[in-house]
Amino acid sequence: MSTGKVVQVIGPVIDVEFPLDEELPTINNALKIKKADGTVLVSEVTLELGDGVVRTIAMDGTDGLQRGLDVEDTGDSIKVPVGKETLGRVFNVLGDTIDGGKELGPDIKRDPIHRDPPDYDELNPSTEVLETGIKVIDLLAPYIRGGKIGLFGGAGVGKTVLIQELIHNIAQEHNGISVFTGVGERTREGNDLYFEMKGSGVLERTAMVYGQMNEPPGARMRVALTGLTIAEHFRDVEGQDVLLFIDNIFRFTQAGSEVSALLGRIPSAVGYQPTLATEMGQLQERITSTKKGSVTSIQAVYVPADDYTDPAPATTFAHLDATTNLERALTQQGIYPAVDPLASTSTALDPQIVGEEHYEVATEVQHVLQRYKELQDIISILGMDELSDEEKTVVARARRIQLFLSQDFSVAAQFTGLPGHYVKIEDTISGFKGILDGKYDDLPEEAFRLVGSIDDVVEKAKKISATED
């Protein structure tokens, strides 16, 4: 392999000169720079400047670097560990373990993080719904196997618990694998998530990859590809259905913007990199279903200043199949998960995909909730007495629907003391159909809160009436 020398260091940007009689490293190749203290820094080739000089982006801090240090071309892009050995472990962008556990041996299989998306003839074009066991998602904003879902929510509205429950349900009911990728978020949150997942028993079916906000932009830009590479191995080699969580996809774009500016590229709209759509496409196109398995991605999306026309979220939206919106007002009413049933959307909510009955029940539920929303102003000003009998019925059923959209989570059982519920799609549909038809109008509203199927509602109603007697 070629060896060169460091000729310039500007922050995370390192220029390396190779002898003209040696082969230049290609774009995306990983270079190893041996520091004076014996440690090795990895950087990635991003530009060829000519005269044997390449410009690289460091994957770690450049403290202690100096001109003249030896640089070795690895001959390939960054390679990270893949396979069952990655489950239950935490990695950085380079695939090094950072959880303080046993180091992975040299024999473990490693894959390059830069790869092409699956060929057209390998894709599985079927639009199969992925059952999550969470009523509000399965009914109103169903996930497609191999699809991409955007998860919107502020701090403290239950994003982490929802992510944990999805990981738990995929592991328990589908025997699936999850890969969690923390991109440019707080180290404290990553640490909390690790210990919460350890406590709730889902860590052994999960691989975690972190490139948090204290990392250089190169690491934050590439860590999503590291997580995706681990997920692709489970899909293509193990034939698994994989859940890939990316928190936060905006930070991936943000890191790309920083790198672009450091490389001297002319910025595009709002200061973003001119290659924004290309970089996003290269990541998103690898997230798909093949004939061997699937990678279903759930991506937390930060929207700068709540501006949905900002190029970063707007570019992300073009790739999403479904959105799950978490609403703070619902947590204040004690409705968990706090998924907004009217704001959450899915391309899978189509009679040709989910079936006529599912589609009709879902649209009728949305219609009733929308009507209730419109009547709330009248109720708050004039009271229930001013409503017609038909409107009173709509309000009563809407409240039952709203409460029935909540349910207990298995991963929260250690805090609530209540067992979690996994609800099959057919049970979800029949339950809401019964509420819409008025079969359960005589049951108390409180019986619908934080339960699983409609049978649990009936049981809870019996207990409530028994205590009242």
Curated annotation (Swiss-Prot):
SMART domains: AAA (SM00382). It is found in: Cell membrane. One of its GO terms (molecular function) is proton-transporting ATP synthase activity, rotational mechanism. It catalyses: ATP + H2O + 4 H(+)(in) = ADP + phosphate + 5 H(+)(out). Keywords: ATP synthesis, ATP-binding, Cell membrane, CF(1), Hydrogen ion transport, Ion transport, Membrane, Nucleotide-binding, Translocase, Transport. Its main location: membrane. Its EC number is 7.1.2.2. Coiled coil: none annotated. It comes from the Bacteria. Pfam families: ATP-synt_ab (PF00006), ATP-synt_ab_N (PF02874), ATP-synt_VA_C (PF22919). ATP binds at residues 153-160. One of its GO terms (cellular component) is plasma membrane. It is a peripheral membrane protein. SUPFAM superfamilies: C-terminal domain of alpha and beta subunits of F1 ATP synthase, N-terminal domain of alpha and beta subunits of F1 ATP synthase, P-loop containing nucleoside triphosphate hydrolases. Disulfide bonds: none annotated. F-type ATPases have 2 components, CF(1) - the catalytic core - and CF(0) - the membrane proton channel. CF(1) has five subunits: alpha(3), beta(3), gamma(1), delta(1), epsilon(1). CF(0) has three main subunits: a(1), b(2) and c(9-12). The alpha and beta chains form an alternating ring which encloses part of the gamma chain. CF(1) is attached to CF(0) by a central stalk formed by the gamma and epsilon chains, while a peripheral stalk is formed by the delta and b chains. Produces ATP from ADP in the presence of a proton gradient across the membrane. The catalytic sites are hosted primarily by the beta subunits. Belongs to the ATPase alpha/beta chains family. This is ATP synthase subunit beta. It comes from Pediococcus pentosaceus (strain ATCC 25745 / CCUG 21536 / LMG 10740 / 183-1w). The gene is atpD.
